[in-house]
């Protein structure tokens, strides 16, 4: 409704001014939307922007009111538009429907890759920021109506996997013992690294394994596949606990076996930017890179980047929009990949780079064995959530409290990580993340549960899609913004915008709840406010689910 109304106002402004860009922007505290077109017309018309704004407002106000129900006001150099009663009525009628915020089905095919951690140990706190950013974006794309495939790119032939395979062969480790496979693989990897650090000459064995797997040796391929699968099974369990699922796992080795890597290296070798010495590399100085981009080693084996290029060419041929989520430590290789694909004339991926989330406990290095796994984070957050839930709802059975505590824990983790803009590093704070009274996932869940409780206590009412008074109108207009925010997230690739929106909706609802009697109101006022509570409940539910968070009916 917000977008439809803005589009109608923009069309009227274009008709009146003759300008394609009518400079609509957020209206702030004074309006729902505003136009700054008077500034751009000032030089052409040789008038002050404030005078132009007055003239535009006077000329279009009747048409705007007739077509949209919005009031037009000139305030200084701005043309402000305040949406009216009809707008609020339409918003509420839509907002109580299941699936509110769902966009029209699109034809543009989107592929989104996220997480893609090396299968040499459990996911850690740093990995799950990638996971949560990627999964939230995926949910927003689906909400916006895009056909989407979510992929996990499995590095099943890199040096880390060679070290694991060597470690299993030389240490006799039982990776099929009881326990999560990713943690068992980490034990092997850490111990193998200790041996390699003590005896560096053993690295020749690792190099030999990498050559064998690239040449297609079946025994070595099998030697690599077994620990990779064991580790991925552990990853999938962790991801499922966080409400995350990938549509497809793509294996790096596929692009060696199907010949795509060899083909792309051949293409690259004929480029003017190619540098063939002992290695094959690309001169990317035209893109600001000082060092050449090495793609093939002196021993003839391809590096990870070469397989990654082949993978992205395949994605570009099968999808219309290609999106990757990568940590800031991958910024160099990510931008080198983009430059190379541009030179090749292939589809260039959009990359969401993120800074890392950390805990006060410090290091998360898998190689040294100093890391805090995602499993440990979830378990500790669940323990703390259980304490909070027990303090609030001691009358519930232990099973009920555990169920709520798990949902609250995942909400706390997901929201605390997604609420910060990806480009900014953050420290996960248990106290803030689990605070039911402040800016947290559980706080938004609690607002939803409160709305559910009000409606259950009300029992029956007659839906009334009207909003009167400052509190009701403010809440209705916040509800109206939900579809707009989803569009902004998928356009700008900024999932934190949805987190901010959901928190603000919870804030406005809580203010409304404390200021306006709902259950104690009578007649039409009661019906009106209960309808608004239901619209809020449904919008909070849709927002929470799009954030990957359970919309609990009771907490």
Curated annotation (Swiss-Prot):
NCBIfam families: argS (TIGR00456)
GO cellular component, one term: cytoplasm
GO MF, one annotated term: ATP binding
Keywords: Aminoacyl-tRNA synthetase, ATP-binding, Cytoplasm, Ligase, Nucleotide-binding, Protein biosynthesis
Pfam families, sorted: Arg_tRNA_synt_N, DALR_1, tRNA-synt_1d
Family annotation (SMART domains): Arg_tRNA_synt_N (SM01016), DALR_1 (SM00836)
Subcellular localization: Cytoplasm
EC nos: 6.1.1.19
Similarity comment: family membership: Belongs to the class-I aminoacyl-tRNA synthetase family.
Cysteines engaged in disulfide bonds, as pairs: none
Gene3D superfamilies assigned to the protein according to its UniProt record, in alphabetical order: Arginyl tRNA synthetase N-terminal domain, HUPs, Isoleucyl-tRNA Synthetase, Domain 1
Top-tier EC class: ligase
Listed GO biological process terms: arginyl-tRNA aminoacylation
Short sequence motif 'HIGH' region: positions: 117-127
Keyword match Nucleotide-binding: yes
Record's keyword annotation contains Calcium: no
Descriptive protein name: Arginine--tRNA ligase
Reactions catalysed: tRNA(Arg) + L-arginine + ATP = L-arginyl-tRNA(Arg) + AMP + diphosphate
InterPro entries: aa-tRNA-synth_I_CS, Arg-tRNA-ligase, Arg-tRNA-synth_N, Arg-tRNA-synth_N_sf, ArgRS_core, DALR_anticod-bd, Rossmann-like_a/b/a_fold, tRNAsynth_Ia_anticodon-bd
